[in-house]
Amino acid sequence: MSLYQRTNFQSHPYHLVWPSPWPFYNSLSLFILTTSGVLTMHGFSNMYIILFIAFINLVWCMTLWFRDIISEGTYLGNHTNAVQRGLNLGVGLFIASEALFFLAIFWTFFHSSLSPNVELGAQWPPLGIKAIDPFELPLLNNIILLSSGVTVNSNYHSLIQGNRKGALYGLVATILLAIVFTIFQGIEYSVSSFTISDGVYGSCFYFSTGFHGFHVLIGTAFLSVGLWRLLGYHLTDHHHLGYESGILYWHFVDVVWLILYVCIYFWGY
């Protein structure tokens, strides 16, 4: 029916999106989540309750938004070839903008580390900072995340070759590796001898690794949606746009981590 209407009433192949409440609700949830998070960090009592509620609400709104997009593409056939080209372009521009964001972070790091001033003790890491050994937990995390890049590439090739079982195993392995990486990153933060308040080194370290960790969480969410769709037989060897976009995003996360490990952990040690 949708194809019939598009053929008879539309002179273009593009999908005219219906009015949706999810962009507004997600923005509102993010605003409340950010505000309550800042207030919790500054010691306001019971703000963690609002933080938790805002997080649950954000996850719920994202789930419903994913549901609508999946319905439009999988069941209604609104994602034509022209729409898919536009979505691919959007993903590419999004990854490019994220790359520029990380470029600014690395610029800040090298601005301070290549020529440390007197306030830093004229050395890097600054005087009084005990940097994390790059050959301990960071090296293990490096191996884990790069291994996840191998498994996610393996499950993609299994999918396009029609090997559904191999695709499922590879995707589950990737998600498990991502979860382990996130847990180890949290352990690293908990045992670190410096905080984000310890000068420019602490700010650069926690902001860069924390922002990357946030991207790992986003990538894990995308891959989890891909796993759910794979289990629901939504994906085929030639129709898997969202799944492929999630894999591209995950490779971007891998590349950023490799640069981050070499520059901040290894060279900055």
Swiss-Prot record:
| CDD domains, A to Z | Cyt_c_Oxidase_III
Enzyme class, first EC level, given as a word: translocase
Single GO MF descriptor: cytochrome-c oxidase activity
EC identifiers of the protein: 7.1.1.9
Q: Please give the family membership noted in the entry.
A: Belongs to the cytochrome c oxidase subunit 3 family.
PANTHER family of this UniProt entry? Answer: CYTOCHROME C OXIDASE SUBUNIT 3 (PTHR11403:SF7), CYTOCHROME C OXIDASE SUBUNIT III (PTHR11403)
Name of the molecule in the record: Cytochrome c oxidase subunit 3
